[in-house]
Amino acid sequence: MAVVDVHRFAESITCHAWSPDLSMVALCPNNTEVHIYKSLSQDHWERLHVLQKHDQIVSGIDWSSKSNKIVTVSHDRNSYVWSLEGAEWVPTLVILRLNRAALCVQWSPKENKFAVGSGAKTVCICYYEQENNWWVSKLIRKRHESSVTSVAWHPNNVLLATTSTDGKCRVFSTFIKGVDTKDSKAGSPAETKFGEQILQLDLSYSWAFGVKWSPSGNTLAYVGHSSMIYFVDDVGPSPLAQSVAFRDLPLRDVLFISEKMVIGVGYDSNPMVFASDDTGIWSFIRYIGEKKAASSNSSYSSQFSEAFGKFYGSQSKSTTANDASESRGGVHDNCINSIVSLSKAGSPKVMRFSTSGLDGKVAIWDLENMEQELGNQF
């Protein structure tokens, strides 16, 4: 089993992020607060801080690895940057200028900017103005036709990928004069204006979620609500796109383990492994959880029996339903909505990652003992 630690912190978890040294985790227990826990032992976590500033549910958290700052966003349309001063976390309000909820947030690789996706069909690019001692929000208003569900920074700190409930994945330039430095190479992202769309992908016919870049920035992956995952190589005027369909429930988020391997998590409550072969063709490999070994036919039969039993109130059918639900995943009991790397930024391989979900659990997964099982792609 790849799981090394599982702990239930709340009834439900909206999002989570780790401190630079991985000794603390910040999470939202599906309310207006952010709780910070420190691991004292494998089975014991102590709550050190409760960050209270937002008025509505916290929808996004990211913890910078270099500056040790926490950024949070909420349905209240605001963002806070938290700095540790002594033993207290001090918030700085960032006015996003949104008229709808903020849905997700991520620090840029250089941590001089962060991006916020929103329900206002816009993306906020926020940066710090030293002269005025405040955070400024610049809006990318073009193109999006619906809520922006996820954002992902390219390693070059300029390109930003987004997904939306309009089913599209887009790549924008976020170059800001005075914040970003120009690349001497011709055709670099710095030569494009702020907010200019570089690419639009119309691969999904349903909501799109969980966009991520590979460690090198050469490949882009995101998921659709129709149980599809999409891979895009050579992002630019002539991209190469692949679609992989699977028969189980849709995914919500993905993480590149290496250039040729991706972990997907979502409504099936069990991480899924996708890998690329030597010819560059992506495919589904396996589930990480051991208890997914039950045959699909018996699983679907058990689900039908469960629904049939609930309809007629049969007690005997509910026993079969419990057995079926346990076989679908031995770690999480509900949708996994977040997956976070536990490796250093820029690392070519991710050996550890964490997941959190609507069951209130945070699970830590270790892939070191699974290299032979996962194959050469790892």
Swiss-Prot record:
GO terms for cellular component: Arp2/3 protein complex; cytoplasm; nucleus. GO terms for molecular function: actin binding. InterPro entries: ARPC1 (IPR017383), WD40/YVTN_repeat-like_dom_sf (IPR015943), WD40_repeat_dom_sf (IPR036322), WD40_rpt (IPR001680). This is Actin-related protein 2/3 complex subunit 1A. Pfam families: WD40. SMART domains: WD40. It is found in: Cytoplasm, Cytoskeleton. Belongs to the WD repeat ARPC1 family. Keywords: Actin-binding, Cytoplasm, Cytoskeleton, Repeat, WD repeat. GO terms for biological process: actin filament organization; Arp2/3 complex-mediated actin nucleation. It comes from the Eukaryota. Expressed at low levels in all tissues with a relatively highest expression in inflorescences. Component of the Arp2/3 complex composed of ARP2, ARP3, ARPC1/p41-ARC, ARPC2/p34-ARC, ARPC3/p21-ARC, ARPC4/p20-ARC and ARPC5/p16-ARC. SUPFAM superfamilies: WD40 repeat-like. Gene3D superfamilies: YVTN repeat-like/Quinoprotein amine dehydrogenase. PROSITE patterns: WD_REPEATS_2, WD_REPEATS_REGION. WD repeats lie at residues 8-47, 53-92, 97-138, 143-182, 203-242, 257-295, 331-375. Functions as a component of the Arp2/3 complex which is involved in regulation of actin polymerization and together with an activating nucleation-promoting factor (NPF) mediates the formation of branched actin networks. Arp2/3 complex plays a critical role in the control of cell morphogenesis via the modulation of cell polarity development.
